[in-house]
C-alpha cells in the first residue's frame, strides 16, 4: 500500500422520485453541482458495500429458491468485520488546490485532512459503528474557489483483491438537491484500487464526473494515471485506524 512521503454537464440518469438520487453511468457520467444549486456547504462522500450473493454463507441457495426476490437485495455487511468477510475497503482522495498545493487524504499515515482550512477535505470514520472505519469524506465547498480538483478513490487495505466479491458504491450527498450515486459493480478480480469520481472546478463551475477506473496497484498508480506528481512510499494504518 502507498503512503505519502512528507515532503457543460450532460444529462444524467435519475432514480425514482422517491429515491431522490442521480446515478452516474458510462453514458451519463457527469453532473454540475453549480447548476443543481449545491456548490456550497459540506459535500459528504460515503463508501458502502455488501457482499455478492455467492460469497454469503449459510443456506443461501435454498433460501433463494423459497424467496427468489432476495437475490435482488443481498444482505448488507456492517462495518469492517474481518470475521464476516475479510474485506477491508477504504476511502481516500487526492487533492489539488488552486495555489498549486497537492496531497492525499486517507487513513494510511493518519492523513485525515481538515475541513475548515487547507485542503478543505476531511476523512471521518463512520460514527454508527463507533470506530474510525475511514468510510466518509467531507469537502467544504464554501472554499470551492480554492479547490482545483479532487479525485475520490477506494482501495483494499489488506492487499487481497476483492472488488469482484463486493457490491460497492460511493454516494455523494450535496448540501442541496439529490444525492449522487456511483456503483463499482464492474468485475475486476485482480484490482486493488479504483478511481471512483473526480470533483473539479471548471471555470468556477463545480463538476462531478464518474471515473470508475480499476488499477492493479495502489495510490501511486492512481497518481501516475491522473498526473498528480506526488512521491509515495510504503504506508500502514495504525491499530486504531484499522
Residue ranges and their predicted role:
Residues 1-149, 153-242:
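Intrinsic-disorder/low-complexity signal
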Amino acid at each position: 500500500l502507498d503512503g505519502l512521503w512528507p515532503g457543460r454537464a450532460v444529462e444524467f440518469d435519475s432514480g425514482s422520485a422517491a429515491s431522490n438520487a442521480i446515478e452516474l453511468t458510462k453514458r451519463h457520467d457527469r453532473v454540475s453541482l453549480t447548476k443543481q444549486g449545491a456548490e456550497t456547504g459540506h459535500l459528504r462522500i460515503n463508501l458502502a458495500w455488501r457482499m455478492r450473493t455467492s460469497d454469503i454463507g449459510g443456506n443461501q441457495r435454498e433460501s433463494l429458491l423459497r424467496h427468489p426476490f432476495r437475490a435482488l437485495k443481498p444482505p448488507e455487511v456492517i462495518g469492517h468485520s474481518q470475521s464476516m468477510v475479510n474485506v477491508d475497503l477504504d476511502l481516500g482522495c487526492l487533492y489539488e488546490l488552486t495555489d498549486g498545493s497537492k496531497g492525499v487524504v486517507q487513513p494510511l499515515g493518519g492523513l485525515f485532512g481538515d475541513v475548515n482550512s487547507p485542503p478543505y477535505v476531511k476523512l471521518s470514520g463512520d460514527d454508527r459503528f463507533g470506530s474510525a472505519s475511514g468510510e466518509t469524506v467531507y469537502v467544504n465547498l464554501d472554499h470551492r474557489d480554492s479547490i482545483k480538483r479532487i479525485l475520490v478513490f477506494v482501495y483494499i487495505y489488506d492487499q487481497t483483491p476483492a472488488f469482484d466479491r463486493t457490491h460497492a458504491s460511493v454516494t455523494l450527498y450535496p448540501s442541496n438537491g439529490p444525492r449522487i450515486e456511483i456503483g463499482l459493480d464492474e468485475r475486476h478480480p485482480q484490482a486493488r484500487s479504483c478511481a471512483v469520481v473526480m470533483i473539479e472546478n471548471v471555470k468556477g463551475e463545480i463538476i462531478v464526473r464518474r471515473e470508475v477506473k480499476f488499477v492493479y496497484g495502489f495510490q501511486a498508480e492512481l497518481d501516475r494515471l491522473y498526473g498528480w506528481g506526488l512521491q509515495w512510499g510504503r504506508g500502514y494504518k495504525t491499530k486504531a485506524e484499522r
